[in-house]
Amino acid sequence: MLRDPTTTGWPPLLLLLLQLPPPPLVCGAPAGPGTGAQASELVVPTRLPGSASELAFHLSAFGQGFVLRLAPDASFLAPEFKIERLGGSSAAAGGEPGLRGCFFSGTVNGERESLAAMSCVAGWSGSFLLAGEEFTIQPQGAGDSLDQPHRLQRWGPGQRREDPGLAAAEVFPLPQGLEWEVEMGNGQGQERSDNEEDRKQDKEGLLKETEDSRKVPPPFGSKTRSKRFVSEARFVETLLVADASMAAFYGTDLQNHILTVMSMAARIYKHPSIRNSVNLVVVKVLIVEKERWGPEVSDNGGLTLRNFCSWQRRFNKPSDRHPEHYDTAILFTRQNFCGKGEQCDTLGMADVGTICDPDKSCSVIKDEGLQAAYTLAHELGHVLSMPHDDSKPCVRLFGPMGKYHMMAPFFIHVNKTLPWSPCSAVYLTELLDDGHGDCLLDAPTSVLPLPTGLPGHSTLYELDQQCKQIFGPDFRHCPNTSVEDICVQLCARHRDSDEPICHTKNGSLLWADGTPCGPGHLCLDGSCVLKEDVENPKAVVDGDWGPWRPWGQCSRTCGGGIQFSNRECDNPMPQNGGRFCLGERVKYQSCNTEECPPNGKSFREQQCEKYNAYNHTDLDGNFLQWVPKYSGVSPRDRCKLFCRARGRSEFKVFEAKVIDGTLCGPDTLSICVRGQCVKAGCDHVVNSPKKLDKCGVCGGKGTACRKISGSFTPFSYGYNDIVTIPAGATNIDVKQRSHPGVRNDGSYLALKTANGQYLLNGNLAISAIEQDILVKGTILKYSGSMATLERLQSFQALPEPLTVQLLTVSGEVFPPKVRYTFFVPNDMDFSVQNSKERATTNIIQSLPSAEWVLGDWSECPSTCRGSWQRRTVECRDPSGQASDTCDEALKPEDAKPCGSQPCPL
């Protein structure tokens, strides 16, 4: 969200305004005319005969002739692009084929390397490239006829030198600029909230999450996953919506305006500093002509965003393959709306990282003329998961990055040579590499070309019109603009004011590129440039990959680590809208694959232990001991560092990604690489086909062990020994199935060590939910007593002998039966008779009192005010049966708010 700057510390003539209507402000003294040769001529195109599907005409200027041969080309729009009007005299939705027929492209003088693009929207205008020179053509009258006078201008890149007849344009430093706000951000926009940092997968520090929270939805309608670490062309198919306030303000120029704004934003996303190939495509435009037909828009920015997100869903097609399906929706409005703290100078609102979520991939833009293009690019950046440049994760990774990138929290002006910060590029790349942007892979049959004409050439963006769009319909350009403010600061004066006082705001509202700034001069990027200084067009340069860099450091010293090599799209770097490199940008390989010395701890366990003295204590002040948590973790979250407090149900996510080379789980050989599971062999090599056989031998044939199996039916109350599984046993599987219709049969699996210490369901305390049992680095997975099939499993070699028991606390007509299997080495002296049916009958003591059993927190619908997380809190006795004897005063909470604030961008 953007906010107007304060006036602190400014000299009287340069004070900036907080709000409109602003107090009087003198922009400066009258500016003198610029100097320089004229690089344009008035021409009248001559229509040439041709086919019905071809437009051909001749121009004479600059001592040469130009013959343009053009064919209809609507690739600026998606193939099924439509404009629909809601609520007006044409309330019924319908396409506008006439608009599609107004775009043409072709060649000049028959040259294969030439390029021409023309539009008949609001008169014939466009541009063409020939022999290294760029030309733009604009009508000089109000009609649509081709044979009226047009101004032909010659352009080129060159050095942008200041007008020698004018003082150099100066951009003054601002105490603060306009502020962006982001959903899940704080009211000041200067740093993101804890919740927002959690969502963005903070690189260090504690992440407090619930089991199911923070899950990014799967790509909507996506059938296949993109390859990781591969640069692929992405297409952001977009719905543009203009509300009734936009229709009233722009009238018949509305569709031209929002397409111009969109094309400017698309150009920003083409810059190589974003380090990805991102193409913006317009699928549909909805123009709301009657307020009641559109989304509810108010001065509450957060509520407006929620309303629009809900409203836009009705127009989206479910299938990503449908030509009218869009990936994100954008609302343009002239309505002022507020963020937090009664600050009503917000320019944009959006949710973070929601691009493939059809319910939340949306943003709201406050229209202020062409400045809306930067707001749109910023808000869409948040939807693509980019945080603010001054957020804690960005600062930790890259240090302070200045205030002039696209994702700066305050909008002053954008560094057009480097619009995207390194942090923005990294977060976007991670989103795409993690598969959360796969909905952007489907390409329309035609892509969106960027218009080459500068907006300042159009009558829609004359200086007076620019002032009206930003300050209001009663304002016009200030005639006494100072030399210092030309092209740099847009100043306006109320048309009914008798005082020669001009107003400005926002710190540095540049004049639109192409705006005349003196005889023979035009504005370009805030500078008044001689037309003849830009004689040759900037050649489009496609990017190409540089060499692979040396392999980096291995992530582990033993047990199978990962090392990376990468290459950059810098040989050459894309320039002037050239294509970003496609293909593999990062490769990795296994390293240090030798086995680690046995220490009784898994690599994931060592990572959890790091937080044992991390200021985490229980209610008595004792430090908690953290062990890995596997049970209840979603498969897509297996590479997050979930840790559980030993002996407790509390767990936390300490890291968004475990160290590369960590096993994804106790029951798989796959390993984590940058937060994603990849296949690996038992030799710790990525993509290796080697597997553990049933004996636990890597690459073995299963001949080094024998199977031990049996069954057991309890015959007495209490704890009954079933079998003692020896150290070294592998592929352990113990099952106790309840009878049909009987969930709690009064019999429960138990597990104890050789010294009599219970690891599971001991002392008549029953674990009702799934859990992990850690035994010297080996994990045994327990299903929980509430499961219909109560099960105890381990795929790793058992480090010490364990005794499996069955606790029986009630009689059954059909007593349950326990079955078990495991494998032991052939040379192990093991006898089932010696290990089972020792049947020590334990006297059942009086059952302890019932206790509260806690479920896992549900997923947060959002982190904004009004949404709640919930969990089950049930009173159960040791047998797992529901009870009413728990102390209500000690009942834990079963609901908590997800957030207490609206979430601005």
From Swiss-Prot:
Question: Which residue intervals are annotated with compositional bias (Basic and acidic residues) in the record?
Answer: 191-215
Which residue range or ranges hold the Peptidase M12B domain?
Answer: 234-444
Keywords per UniProt? Cleavage on pair of basic residues, Disulfide bond, Extracellular matrix, Glycoprotein, Heparin-binding, Hydrolase, Metal-binding, Metalloprotease, Protease, Repeat, Secreted, Signal, Zinc, Zymogen
- Cystine links in this protein are 309-362, 338-344, 356-439, 394-423, 478-502, 487-523, 517-528, 554-591, 558-596, 569-581
Q: Domain TSP type-1, which positions? A: 542-597, 848-904
Q: In which tissues is it expressed?
A: Expressed specifically in adult lung and heart and low expression during mouse development.
Give the cofactor note: Binds 1 zinc ion per subunit.
Q: Which SMART domains match?
A: ACR (SM00608), TSP1 (SM00209)
The record lists Zn(2+) as bound by: 378, 382, 388
Q: Name one GO biological process term.
A: proteolysis
Q: Which residues form the propeptide?
A: 29-228
Signal peptide, first to last residue: 1-28
Query: Which intervals of the chain are annotated as region Disordered?
Result: 139-163, 186-225, 877-905
Entries under InterPro entries matching the protein? ADAM_Cys-rich, ADAMTS/ADAMTS-like, ADAMTS_ADAMTS-like, ADAMTS_CR_2, ADAMTS_CR_3, ADAMTS_spacer1, MetalloPept_cat_dom_sf, Pept_M12B_ADAM-TS8
Where does the record place the catalytic residues? 379
Q: Which residues form the Disintegrin domain?
A: 453-541
* Superkingdom of origin organism: Eukaryota
List glycan-bearing residues: 415, 480, 506, 615
Cofactor(s) recorded for this entry are: Zn(2+)
EC number, as in UniProt: 3.4.24.-
Domain remark text: The spacer domain and the TSP type-1 domains are important for a tight interaction with the extracellular matrix.
- Write the protein's name: A disintegrin and metalloproteinase with thrombospondin motifs 8
Q: Lineage of the native species?
A: Eukaryota, Metazoa, Chordata, Craniata, Vertebrata
The gene designation is Adamts8
